[in-house]
């Protein structure tokens, strides 16, 4: 173990840890844009700079390894000034339409500007003028808002493996895009939307959530994806009894925040107008609405009316364990083992 | 799965056979690609050039329905080249000699004749797999949905045991379960021969334990499987069918047969969230709550039990399945009084040794637990068979190659195989009603090769009629290099082009799984 001091507090960490990790262990906050513990380090955004005693320049804490006896300051005047200049530069060509931006309230650029009191840019930069990319049904790409942190690109290459997007060009003309500036539909993109979850600003917006609520109005419920047997953790964001957004759950031990298109964008069947909302009974050849009592009485009568061996049931690989358990308990209690589900199918 | 999903990225070699993982289990697919980037050898075996094949060190494109021959060929090479794990075979297994004798004739040359895979590639695959520090096999329906599915699974086990690749981190045999809770449905005894935790219903101990707890006597004789239930209806033996959240009218092989049964059964109850093709045939339809509208647990493919939490209320008068079942039980005088899913789970844990140590409280605190978890202190089991197999020794079973039940002939010259795609799921009940996915992939496109397209004078987007001995469908075609000449691929997501009108309901004699993966068809241009 290596021992160092951050803002006057002592901390011990593994020798291969970075200053950022040591600070995290102490609960000391350091802002970042381009850092993610699951991705390769690039040290590009310079938001995480800190002062280390005995070193002349500020260092990027995300990719500077700790040394024994190191003395670190994360909140000095110098550090703040550097971060402010950074934000200032980013704001120089960032649209300030926070009023209608879906990311408002959950945007790291907004949060850090608030924290360091940066309200507008002192630099007069050229504005970017990219057309909105909204041809796919899953999410909108507004590259005018992109701060080029590269999280989406690394997520696509290192987590998904699709490798659909790159940072094209250099300098002011840098832009995240699929090859040949093609729309994502014509690229290897599989619309997992993990880039959307990774983006710290409002450059990538899921279409299903637009206008459905501010992040701070939403309640989060952690649950499990209803599709395949991988069992990825999902975070459902709820407002007024409606799921308005879905993200991968980073705390889930199976999926660690990863998802595919079905889990991410495929659960709004919940609010389909075709959902069944009342029991139906066949009368004169037609299915007609009925009360629960009438339907359940009829089913109970029919279940009672046959010998156990004349009864069979298909249980569900979609339903919960508890429901499958009760289904087989019910049928077995009625004297039949004729129970199966589509495991074989 | 004998391993955990989290172990995939550290494997030395991955053998993926009959699984289009990046489309059917995408997040597991990400992990396989991660493993490959970290240096694992990736071997993909499939009749189609699936997406994962593009990332593979070695892609073996075998003829559909020839898995056992290929697996036997790999074992043959491993034994012949001295790559077998002799210590593992000696200490942990039995029946090696018989199995070794059976694979003797499966030389790479002979296997090439059957499978169409070059003998050299078979040798290379065997070496990559057997020489890795830890090697894991993954398969899905491409292995099981055959009339010889049970043999395929046994051959996979033989391969893993001969190379000592079981019972270790990142090494094992991993069937990837299709639906979110298919593992749980099996664990819960939604099967004709076992109650929870695979306790045989006809065993005396099971009988007395459940009788004491439930207060009713369990029927002793094992019941009918899904395919037998359909036949039972047609024979007149089964009069009432209760379907909870399944859609056999689209998912079952030889659909016409199933539709006939659903029409014939005296009373059909269907409990579901949509008016599915099956529900439309019902006498009573009960509206159910969907996953985000109730509490409970799912068990994933790595045996991990996880909490499912309610986020919103069910629409209208729809109710959770467990509520409906309890209502029925009380009308039938069974006197259930569960206060909620947690109480049901406590009963499951009480009656099921592999779930005994699991509770909602632990799931909440520990983020899921993998069975077997026999007591409250047990941390769960990330990989199975660590020190010994469930039954003591691992048993080798000799397996012979058996051709598919139906092969292409002069009248039906093409081979049809079925599966899923990335965007849709199963019978499409949920994904087709998603506002984004539905319109993005609105229709089925049957895949055929360039060669066959040219021969038949068909172009991309043309409407064709595909027929088998059992039925016909009209569908548009996609001309692609994914399928080899002679093979047609369709998914079963779309009722407008219900591929199961064509498939063969010939089942594996043991597992009773129909042969979805191979049947003979012909294809001709259709008038719209
Ligand atoms: S949606 Fe997924 S595949 Fe597509 S660009 Fe984003 S991360 Fe890559
Ligand atoms: S789109 Fe978002 S995640 Fe991607 S580089 Fe731009 S700001 Fe970063
Ligand atoms: S998010 Fe995708 S991979 Fe994960 S469980 Fe759902 S369907 Fe499967």
Task: Label every model-predicted segment.
Chain A
Residues 1-9:
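Eukaryote-biased recognition of intrinsically disordered, low-complexity regulatory segments
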Residues 5, 51, 237-238:
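A general beta-strand register signal
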Residues 8-68, 77-82:
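N-terminal cofactor/phosphate-binding cores enriched in small/glycine residues
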Residues 10, 164, 233-235:
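Short, surface-exposed charged micro-motifs
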Residues 34, 62, 72, 165, ...:
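Short clusters of hydrophobic/aromatic residues that line enzyme substrate/ligand-binding pockets
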Residues 35-38, 142-145, 180-185, 311-320:
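Conserved short loop/turn motifs at secondary-structure junctions
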Residues 46-191, 196-223, 242:
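Fe-S ferredoxin-like electron-transfer domains
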Residues 95, 212-345:
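Catalytic alpha/large subunits of respiratory electron-transfer oxidoreductases
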């Amino acid at each position: 173990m290596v021992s160092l001091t951050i803002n006057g507090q002592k901390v011990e960490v593994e020798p291969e840890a970075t200053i950022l990790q040591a600070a995290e262990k102490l609960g000391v906050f350091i802002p970042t844009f381009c850092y993610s513990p699951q991705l390769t380090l690039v040290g590009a955004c310079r938001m995480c700079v800190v002062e280390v005693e005995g070193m002349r320049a500020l260092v990027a804490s995300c990719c500077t390894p700790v040394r024994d006896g190191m003395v670190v300051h994360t909140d000095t005047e110098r550090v703040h000034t550097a971060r402010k200049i950074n934000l200032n530069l980013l704001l120089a060509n960032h649209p300030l339409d926070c009023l209608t931006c879906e990311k408002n309230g959950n945007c790291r650029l907004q949060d850090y500007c608030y924290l360091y009191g940066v309200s507008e840019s002192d630099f007069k930069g050229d504005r970017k003028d990219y057309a909105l990319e909204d041809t796919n049904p899953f999410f909108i790409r507004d590259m005018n808002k992109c701060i080029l942190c590269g999280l989406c690109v690394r997520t696509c290459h290192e987590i998904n493996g699709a490798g659909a997007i790159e940072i094209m060009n250099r300098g002011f003309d840098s832009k995240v895009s699929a090859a040949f500036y093609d729309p994502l539909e014509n690229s290897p993109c599989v619309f997992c939307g993990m880039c959307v979850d990774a983006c710290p600003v409002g450059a990538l917006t899921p279409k299903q959530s637009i206008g459905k609520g501010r992040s701070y109005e939403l309640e989060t419920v952690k649950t499990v994806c209803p599709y395949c047997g991988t069992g990825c953790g999902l975070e459902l964001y709820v407002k007024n009894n409606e799921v308005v957004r879905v993200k991968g759950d980073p705390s889930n031990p199976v999926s660690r925040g990863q998802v595919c298109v079905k889990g991410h964008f495929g659960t709004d069947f919940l609010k389909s107008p075709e959902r069944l909302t009342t029991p139906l009974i066949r009368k004169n050849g037609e299915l007609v609405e009925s009360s629960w009592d009438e339907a359940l009485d009829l089913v109970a009568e029919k279940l009672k009316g046959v010998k156990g061996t004349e009864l069979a049931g298909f249980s569900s690989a979609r339903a919960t364990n508890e429901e499958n358990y009760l289904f087989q308990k019910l049928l077995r209690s009625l004297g039949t083992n004729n129970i199966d589900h589509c495991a074989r199918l | 799965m004998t391993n955990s999903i989290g172990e995939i990225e550290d494997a030395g070699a991955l053998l993926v056979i009959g699984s289009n993982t990046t489309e059917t289990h995408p997040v597991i697919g990400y992990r396989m690609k991660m493993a490959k980037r970290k240096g694992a050898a990736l071997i993909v075996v499939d009749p189609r050039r699936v997406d994962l094949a593009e990332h593979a060190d070695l892609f073996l494109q075998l003829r559909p329905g020839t898995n056992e021959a290929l697996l036997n060929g790999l074992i043959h090479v491993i034994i012949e080249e001295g790559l077998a794990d002799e210590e593992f075979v000696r200490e942990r297994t039995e029946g090696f000699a018989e199995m070794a004798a059976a694979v003797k004739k499966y030389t790479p040359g002979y296997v090439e004749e059957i499978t169409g895979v070059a003998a050299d590639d078979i040798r290379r695959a065997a070496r990559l797999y057997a020489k890795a520090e830890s090697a894991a096999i993954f398969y899905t329906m491409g292995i099981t949905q055959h009339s010889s599915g049970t043999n395929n699974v046994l051959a996979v086990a033989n391969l893993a045991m001969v190379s000592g690749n079981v019972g270790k981190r990142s090494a094992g045999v991993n069937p990837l379960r299709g639906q979110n809770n298919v593992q749980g449905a099996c664990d819960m005894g939604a099967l004709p021969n076992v109650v929870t935790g695979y306790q045989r219903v006809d065993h005396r101990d099971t009988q007395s334990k459940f009788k004491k707890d439930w207060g009713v006597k369990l029927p002793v004789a094992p019941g009918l499987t899904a395919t037998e239930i359909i036949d039972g209806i047609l024979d007149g033996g089964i009069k009432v069918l209760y379907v909870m959240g399944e859609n056999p009218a689209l998912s079952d092989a030889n659909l016409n047969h199933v539709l006939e049964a659903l029409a014939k059964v005296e009373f059909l109850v269907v409990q579901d969230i949509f008016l599915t093709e099956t529900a439309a045939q019902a006498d009573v339809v009960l509206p159910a709550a969907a996953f985000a509208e109730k509490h409970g647990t799912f068990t994933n493919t790595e045996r991990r039990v996880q909490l499912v939490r309610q986020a919103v209320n069910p629409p209208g008068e729809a109710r959770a399945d467990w509520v409906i079942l309890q209502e029925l039980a009380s009308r039938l005088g069974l006197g259930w009084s569960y206060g909620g899913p947690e109480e049901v789970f406590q009963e499951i844990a009480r009656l099921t040794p592999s779930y005994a140590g699991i509770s909602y409280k632990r799931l909440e605190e520990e983020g899921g637990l993998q069975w077997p978890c026999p007591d409250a202190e047990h941390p769960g089991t990330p990989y199975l068979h660590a020190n010994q197999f469930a039954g003591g020794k691992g048993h080798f079973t000799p397996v012979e190659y058996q051709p598919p039940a139906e092969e292409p002939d002069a009248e039906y010259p093409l081979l049809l195989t079925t599966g899923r795609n990335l965007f849709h799921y199963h019978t499409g009940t949920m994904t087709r009603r998603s506002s984004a996915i539905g319109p993005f992939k609105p229709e089925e496109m049957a895949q055929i090769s360039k060669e066959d397209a040219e021969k038949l004078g068909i172009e991309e987007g043309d409407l064709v009629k595909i027929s088998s001995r059992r039925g016909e469908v009209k569908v548009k075609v996609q001309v692609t290099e994914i399928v080899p000449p002679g093979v047609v691929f369709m998914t079963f997501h779309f009722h407008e082009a219900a591929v199961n009108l064509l498939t063969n309901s010939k089942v594996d004699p043991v597992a009773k799984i129909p042969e979805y993966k191979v049947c003979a068809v012909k294809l001709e241009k259709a008038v719209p």
